[in-house]
Swiss-Prot record:
Effect of residue 348 to A: Confers resistance to Syringomycin E, showing impaired catalytic activity
Matches recorded under InterPro entries: Cyt_B5-like_heme/steroid-bd (IPR001199), Cyt_B5-like_heme/steroid_sf (IPR036400), Cyt_B5_heme-BS (IPR018506), Fatty_acid_hydroxylase (IPR006694), Scs7 (IPR014430)
Signal sequence extent: none
Transmembrane segments: 198-216, 222-246, 285-302, 305-328
UniProt entry tagged with the keyword Hydrolase: no
Keywords: Electron transport, Endoplasmic reticulum, Fatty acid biosynthesis, Fatty acid metabolism, Heme, Iron, Lipid biosynthesis, Lipid metabolism, Membrane, Metal-binding, Oxidoreductase, Transmembrane, Transmembrane helix, Transport, Zinc
SUPFAM superfamilies assigned: Cytochrome b5-like heme/steroid binding domain
Lineage, uppermost ranks: Eukaryota, Fungi, Dikarya, Ascomycota, Saccharomycotina
Protein name: Ceramide very long chain fatty acid hydroxylase SCS7
Phenotype reported upon loss of the gene: Causes a lack of alpha-hydroxylated very long chain fatty acids in yeast sphingolipids. This confers resistance to syringomycin E, an antifungal cyclic lipodepsinonapeptide produced by Pseudomonas syringae.
Primary localization class, coarse: endoplasmic reticulum
Amino acid sequence: MSTNTSKTLELFSKKTVQEHNTANDCWVTYQNRKIYDVTRFLSEHPGGDESILDYAGKDITEIMKDSDVHEHSDSAYEILEDEYLIGYLATDEEAARLLTNKNHKVEVQLSADGTEFDSTTFVKELPAEEKLSIATDYSNDYKKHKFLDLNRPLLMQILRSDFKKDFYVDQIHRPRHYGKGSAPLFGNFLEPLTKTAWWVVPVAWLPVVVYHMGVALKNMNQLFACFLFCVGVFVWTLIEYGLHRFLFHFDDWLPESNIAFATHFLLHGCHHYLPMDKYRLVMPPTLFVILCAPFYKLVFALLPLYWAYAGFAGGLFGYVCYDECHFFLHHSKLPPFMRKLKKYHLEHHYKNYQLGFGVTSWFWDEVFGTYLGPDAPLSKMKYE
């Protein structure tokens, strides 16, 4: 098998590898060292998926050499290396290091040039997805960037800082990963109020959707009500784009004010600073009520009453789909037809935060000239 020395890969324990042993999550090792995630390859394997699943979570060195089972060409090894290599199996000594790390992850250096993956540097090509969840070295990050110390409550650091706007905007969009759950914002009894699980959004808002649509269906032509519902969903996609581009990313219009920085941080900056924090990803209901109220009043002021009920139900349903989609783009293995959208959104975080504002689609990005394509430039990094 060819040797790849140009990647910085992650280290995994044997126990971790053994846990990835199903058709939906299949890892194998080669030469008891290289780890491959072959889940996507199962359906494409010429010899069928059963021959691979028999070795899920195990080493495939001997079976790869066994021509009686299946002949493997050099290109088969190259495909494994280029497309499915995700990390290395820890030795006993390395495993001991893993067990002393609360996040059970240690990044190992495998490249010949001595470079390491740095999430705070925007990149042309996204790294392996597993890398996005490697914990930031808090101490080194603070020493290098002189920005926020992940060991201490973040909001008070911003309020007490002497950051200039350009420095704050530059640094807040450079991704970090806390690695121990959610980083502290307040560090006191208010902390639980800053966290929202993904399931809260449908539980809180789908009943409201059902109520408003139910009122519309009872009081107007049902086919027309469904049409207005669909219009509401479509209008939401434009609102989604507009809010993300002009409210969440009001970076250029930020005043030189710590209160403004703190507001920006709570509204959206925190998500860019810690994009893989699963409890700071969907919108807290309280914040959504504040943002939604003007739109609710506008819809009911402009449209006949029951038209407004149907249209608002569609818009609210569109929001629920958006927030759930946003969560799963960050935290799930998605079917093939969703992978381009996932890549597109992650590039908004790790490549260029000034493009790619659509989350559920890139339609409005194409309309308004903010499409984040393969040739798009990296966001500038002014402060190192």
